[in-house]
């Protein structure tokens, strides 16, 4: 849609629908996760700008074309790398070994009409269920991944640095503050949890309510916002911590920033 007039500019059917992550790049390309049909998945479409319209990659040219994003949230690094969390369907690693994979693609190497090769793909613990899991980036090429039972740190080269098992069930996308600490929601325990970046050790946990089925948001002044349930009512929680802002030059949270614009680089 045109942001001034609201007039529809373009529409296109995606393979098996679309839900979860959608991000825009400053060169006009758009990354859109697809759905799944009859056990078949199509990964992440790349839309290429063509004048006042776009053309999309074929299913075979998509990122992670044979694994399933499953409603996850995409992250983009300042270097143009795209990170996608998938439910493992066995295209590259046996489903007996892992239920979740993280793919890294270099958008700068992606060209229209060509099949893109991932920079790397890495197995992570836990499962990427249909609950909006995803990734945050620290600005140095490292990413933090949420699955149902683990928060995992991955290096810029795809190596797992640490994997922290959550006490209950994680939910949403981790957020990173300007001191590098990582936050996630434990939906089952109703807690906001803070992790130390070097080791993944939990150094703080704040009981807020119940059913924290959301992703934490860190504002420009460092306030952490979380939505959940309290005494049976939908509630917005505001938490003041030690941080004074969100991670600079980083995909610091769901949507990349407090505005959730999905558009930074």
Language-model regions, residue ranges each:
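Extracytoplasmic/lumenal domain signature
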Residues: 1-265
């Amino acid at each position: 849609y045109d942001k001034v007039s609201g007039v529809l500019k373009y529409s296109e059917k995606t393979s098996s629908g679309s839900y979860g992550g959608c991000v825009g790049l400053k060169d006009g390309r758009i990354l859109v996760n697809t759905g799944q049909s009859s056990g078949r998945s199509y990964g992440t479409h790349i839309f290429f700008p063509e004048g006042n319209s776009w053309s999309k990659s074929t299913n075979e040219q998509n990122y992670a074309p044979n694994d399933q994003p499953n409603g996850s949230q995409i992250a983009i690094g300042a270097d143009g790398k795209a990170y996608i969390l998938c439910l493992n369907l066995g295209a590259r690693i046996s489903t007996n070994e892992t239920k979740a994979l993280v793919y890294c693609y270099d958008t700068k190497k992606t060209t229209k009409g060509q099949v893109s090769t991932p920079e790397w793909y890495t197995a992570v613990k836990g499962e990427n269920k249909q609950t909006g899991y995803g990734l945050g980036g620290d600005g140095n090429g490292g990413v933090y991944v949420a699955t149902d039972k683990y928060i995992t740190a991955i290096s810029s080269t795809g190596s797992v640095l640490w994997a922290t098992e959550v006490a209950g069930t994680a939910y949403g996308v981790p957020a990173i503050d300007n001191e590098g600490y990582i936050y996630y929601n434990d939906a089952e325990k109703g807690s906001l949890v803070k992790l130390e970046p070097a080791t993944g050790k939990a150094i703080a946990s704040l009981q807020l309510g119940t059913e924290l089925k959301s992703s934490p948001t860190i504002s420009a002044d460092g306030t952490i916002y979380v939505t959940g349930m309290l005494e049976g009512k939908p509630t917005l929680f505001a938490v003041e911590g030690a941080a004074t802002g969100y991670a600079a030059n980083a995909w610091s949270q769901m949507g990349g920033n407090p505005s959730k614009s999905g558009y930074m680089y």
